[in-house]
Structure formats: C-alpha cells, structure tokens
Amino acid sequence: MAAYLLAVAILFCIQGWPSGTVQGQVRPFLEVHERSACQARETLVPILQEYPDEISDIFRPSCVAVLRCSGCCTDESLKCTPVGKHTVDLQIMRVNPRTQSSKMEVMKFTEHTACECRPRRKQGEPDGPKEKPRRGGVRARFPFV
C-alpha cells in the first residue's frame, strides 16, 4: 500500500495539479479521489423536506443551499455520516396562497460541519433513540429504552 501511495505521489509531482480541467482533458486520480471523498458539501434541500408540516404555505425559494455530508467511503460497509452540526438562520419568503399575502421570515436549518465514514446500520435497526408516545400525541425520546 505504501508503494502505491508513493507512486501516486510521484505521478502527482510529475503531472502537477490542474487548476481546472478543460473539456477533453483527463482529470487526475488524486483530484477525482479528493472531490469524491466523504465531506460536507453544498447541497440543495427542499424546505418542505425540513418543514413537512408547513404544506399550506409556499416558500421562495422552495429549496435552500446548506452544507450536508456526502461522498464515498473506502468500504461499502461504511456510510458518510455527520459528526458535527450547527444551525443556520436563513431568510425565506412565506406566501399564503389563500390570502395572497407574503412575508419574510427567518427559518432554521441544520448544516453539517464535520463528516466521517461510519458503519452502516443493519436493515430494521432504528435510526436513532426509540420514541415513546406522551399525552397529547407528542413523542418523547428515550435513548436508554
């Protein structure tokens, strides 16, 4: 493996790193590998995907650009997973189609700040902590159940 990496590094030094590829040029392996790696990258996310209970209104824009983990891991048993997150406030126009009124408002979206390749969950395994119904239909999270 070390010999392979050394050979790739030597090729990198000989060929140089292109600032951009022109149509018809081959993009070098190291650039392809780096660009496809698991990392936070700008992703378009539909607002209704993040706020599914807000279907009575129309949002402009209908999707927002946020950083989300995406990319390839070295093994098919691994998945690119967020390990760091923060919230960003974005100004969105909300349109009420019934009244034809619109207003600007700030909506919160999660951005991924750090990503790692982690083992995939087995089919049927829950995505997170189990939820128990509470009075009034609200669900509470119990990570220890």
UniProtKB/Swiss-Prot annotation:
Q: Which residues form the propeptide?
A: 135-145
Does the keyword Disulfide bond belong to this entry?
yes
Q: Which domain of life is it from?
A: Eukaryota
* UniProt xrefs under Pfam families: PDGF
Q: Which residues fall in a compositionally biased region of kind Basic and acidic residues?
A: 118-131
Report the GO terms under cellular component: extracellular space; membrane
Which keywords does this Swiss-Prot/TrEMBL entry list?
Disulfide bond, Growth factor, Pyrrolidone carboxylic acid, Secreted, Signal, Toxin
Q: Enumerate the SUPFAM superfamilies for this protein.
A: Cystine-knot cytokines (SSF57501)
User: Using the chain's own numbering, where are the disulfide bonds?
Assistant: C38-C80, C69-C115, C73-C117
Family label: Belongs to the PDGF/VEGF growth factor family. Snake venom VEGF subfamily.
Q: What does this protein do?
A: Snake venom VEGFs may contribute to venom dispersion and prey subjugation by inducing vascular permeability and hypotension. The hypotension is mediated by nitric oxide (NO), which is produced by VEGF-activated endothelium NO synthase. Also induces angiogenesis in vitro, probably through VEGF receptor (KDR/VEGFR-2) signaling. May also induce capillary permeability through VEGF receptor (KDR/VEGFR-2) signaling.
The record describes its quaternary structure and partners as: Homodimer; disulfide-linked. Interacts with VEGF receptor-2 (KDR) with high affinity, but not with VEGF receptor-1 (Flt-1), VEGF receptor-3 (FLT4), and neuropilin-1 (NRP1).
Protein name from the UniProt record: Snake venom vascular endothelial growth factor toxin vammin
Organism the protein comes from: Vipera ammodytes ammodytes
